[in-house]
């Protein structure tokens, strides 16, 4: 009897996980976070600034529209599991700037100034 209950519970949990699955778009991904919003950019990065100055370690990007966004460079305020992801985002933005790839949309945390990038969607 216990095996049957466990199987039913396990199947219900597994079905629940499969139903939600991985996000299929930046909009779905962004909706999983609090204090975020989507910005439709559809443009190339106009300027890329990287600062390694103490507590203000970050990358700042701007667009022709004047919109400004940041990615913090990993520092003591981040846990180890966040550091690699932040470094990848910083590297992605640098490559995007250098190759003049268009950024389609950004998901940003709007509780920081400038708004901090949580996810990015690009197009060629």
Curated annotation (Swiss-Prot):
The gene is eltB. This is Heat-labile enterotoxin B chain. Changing residue 96 to A: In strain: Isolate 240-3. GO terms for cellular component: extracellular region. Residues 1-21 form the signal peptide. It comes from Escherichia coli. GO terms for molecular function: toxin activity. SUPFAM superfamilies: Bacterial enterotoxins. The biological activity of the toxin is produced by the A chain, which activates intracellular adenyl cyclase. Keywords: Disulfide bond, Enterotoxin, Signal, Toxin, Virulence. Disulfide bonds join 30-107. InterPro entries: Enterotoxin, Enterotoxin_B. Transmembrane segments: none annotated. Heterohexamer of one A chain and of five B chains.
